[in-house]
Amino acid sequence: VDTCADDGSPGSLRAQVTAAASGDLIDLSQLTCSTITLANSAIMVTQPSLTLQGRGPEALTIDGAGHYSAFYHLGAGTLGIADVTIANGYYAGSFEPKGGCIFSKGNVFLFHSVVTHCTVGSLSASEPAIGGGVYAEGNLTMKNSTITESHVLASVNGPNAFGGGGYVIGSVAMLYSTISNNTATQFFGANVGDGGGLFVKGAVDITYSTISGNSADYVGGLEIFSNQPATIFNGTISGNVGKLGYGGLWTKSALTISNSTIAFNAARSDASGTSTAGLHSLAPLVLQSSIIADNIGPNGPSDLGGMAGISITGDNNLITSYTLPPPMNTRSECPHLQPLADNGGSTRTHELSHTSVAIDHGSNPLTLQKDQRFATRDVGAATDIGSVEWQPGETDERLFVAGFDGLCDQ
């Protein structure tokens, strides 16, 4: 590709994609311009597999101009996006209102890329708005990537909307990645939105990653609507809001969480009184050395809950409130978490204050060498509980930033 113009000329991105064979790499790394603005429609990718290689998400943006989705992938293979920002995709209609920036009949692989400011709205009485940032009928893999500021809007007279950041029918694998500030919500006060950050119907593997600041009517952060296994380790789920119920994480899949933090999520209103602000599960849980705290429901602290009678095993956790029996050796003191911040590494995390009872009271079942921000694990007498290992010399100054006051610190 040798031009940022979307004019169909031989060196344009659209022309190069049309001419490519399956498995080809489209090289955008030599472009000196910063933005390719789509002029007429989404770029159709009919090949089973294709990869786009840019020169960095801060250096090159493919812009839907607020009128079109950026890519419409019809192949059953993988659409790879590397070192690119995909932005300002928009689709509002009645035919397949899916994938505000990326629509794929196959798999999507994001490497060192950003998907941002994408929107899907349904104008159909039967078709839901799905996947504000990304819609994938196969798998979504994210490495050092971010999906942010994307939205789905429920139709006035139609079904709910699902997956503000993304909707994935296959599996999701996140490594060193972030899903943040996405929404799934009502359109003119009609139906509701589910899964503000991510809605997944397959297996889930989240490592060294953060899901934060997302919101929906139900399940602000991550909704796992699957019977396949799910795992989270060295992960953070924080600051997600379910306006009508379920804040951080809702799962019907058997879930294992290790060395992770689920905190400061909220469920603002719940007429039934059965939803949970932090982690709500309908299936067996294994919880290892994780913090679930400072989550708040309409009636107060709300950290761990779900369907009565499910198996919950593990040890060395810190869970401050629960409606289901927690695993053995669970502490319930305040963890004294600092605000979500850039503490090093690829994703934002919650550091521990130096007085936290989480320090030296955890375990390391996966023998991790690093914490979420890639600092050394197992500093001191034992592993710390949660996604971040306290390091000697770290201060607690962020505890006193304006407007920050953890629920259990009050």
Please provide the spans of the model-predicted regions.
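N-terminal, post-signal-peptide segments of secreted/periplasmic proteins
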Residues: 1-106, 269-274, 281-396
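Short, solvent-exposed mixed-charge patches
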Residues: 408-410
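Glycine-centric low-complexity/flexibility signal
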Residues: 91-99, 119-135, 152-163, 183, ...
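Predominantly extracellular beta-rich ligand-binding scaffolds that present long acidic/polar faces
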Residues: 104-115, 126, 136-149, 168-194, ...
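Generic short beta-strand segments
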Residues: 31-32, 87-88, 117-119, 151, ...
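Ser/Thr-rich, Pro/Gly/Ala-heavy low-complexity intrinsically disordered linkers and tails
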Residues: 195, 221, 396-406
